[in-house]
A protein has these predicted regions:
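N-terminal glycine/serine-rich phosphate-binding loop of ATP-dependent small-molecule kinases
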Residues: 1-92
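Active-site nucleophile and cofactor-binding loops and adjacent substrate-binding regions
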Residues: 103-110, 237-241
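Glycine-rich phosphate-binding loop plus the immediately following alpha-helix
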Residues: 31-37, 106-108, 113-115, 119-122, ...
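Short beta-strand-loop/turn "lid" adjacent to the catalytic site in phosphate-handling enzymes
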Residues: 52-106, 142-147, 153-154, 182-193, ...
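Gly/Thr-rich phosphate-binding beta-strand-loop-beta motif of the actin/hexokinase/Hsp70
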Residues: 1-25, 117, 121-145, 161, ...
Length: 260
């Protein structure tokens, strides 16, 4: 089995690929102050709960956009699975069958999204990843990353309000019944949730206009189900798209290794 790790700013998402399907997907809050032991115990517990031995893991692929978490999780992988993970980075990006945009700067999560979308949908599309940041990654049907747009994610926007204003606070991310908020909670929900609905539609519309093509929009990420009004707007909602890209990159790297 193949194990994938996607280290983001909010969560460490772990996917176990059982040759033809995602057998399990787990999420652990990403906290840099937690020791390696914390993550090691959590991951081992996941395997115990699913009645699996850690030795079923044949290879591990790791993506990280949090530098101070990378080595910590690498050490956990070495300790638990007795192997070195394949770490996504510029040297690997340059060997991929797709054309990676600015390989020495682009985030490995964006590359994974592009790879997953290219191989899954076989056409030019834009991936809207709802995470700590909301990212829009456009990839062509020929496997070329065409460009990226980045804005703060929903939770990040709420946190910014609560941290930078005296009287506003965190609120649940729910669709408001009305655009006319009647208290602090519904006012923030109206502004953020309805506002982000418009933001997503406008960014995708601008990309389509620039390309001169009505390309499909694909949603992924932990917050992709929050703005339910966008459900019909997306061609597909694929919560495991980043992991799928990681898997494909891992399999491609393994084939390259066999040839050398």
């Amino acid at each position: 089995m193949l194990l994938t790790f996607d280290i983001g700013n909010s969560d460490v998402t772990i996917g176990l690929w059982d040759h033809s399907t995602w057998r399990n997907v787990w999420r652990i809050p990403a906290k840099a102050d937690q020791p390696e032991l914390f993550y090691g115990i959590r991951i081992r517990d996941y395997f115990t709960e699913t009645k699996l031995e850690v030795n079923v893991v044949e290879s591990v692929v790791l993506s990280s956009v949090v530098p101070n978490m990378t080595e910590k999780i690498r050490n956990v992988i070495r300790s638990l699975f007795n192997m070195e993970p394949l770490l996504l980075g510029p040297s690997l990006f340059e060997k991929l069958p797709m054309k990676v945009l600015n390989p020495y700067e682009v985030g490995s999560d964006l590359v994974s999204n592009a790879m997953g979308a290219w191989q899954t949908y076989k056409r030019t599309c834009v991936v809207c990843d709802f995470g700590t940041a909301l990212t829009f990654t456009t990839v062509s049907g020929n496997g070329e990353m065409l460009g990226v747009s980045i804005v703060p994610g929903l939770r990040t926007a709420i946190r910014a309000l609560s941290q930078n204003t005296a009287k506003l606070f965190d609120v649940p991310l729910e669709i408001p019944k009305s655009a006319l908020g009647t208290n602090t909670v519904t006012a923030i929900q109206s502004g953020l949730v309805l506002g982000y609905d418009g933001l997503v539609r406008n960014v995708v519309s601008s990309i389509r206009k620039e390309l001169g093509e009505e390309i499909p929009a694909i949603a992924t990420g932990g917050m992709s189900f929050v703005i339910t009004s966008l459900k019909g707007f997306f061609f597909d909602i694929n919560p495991n798209l980043t992991l799928e890209g990681l898997r494909l990159i891992g399999e491609y790297a393994a084939e390259l290794k066999k040839k050398t």
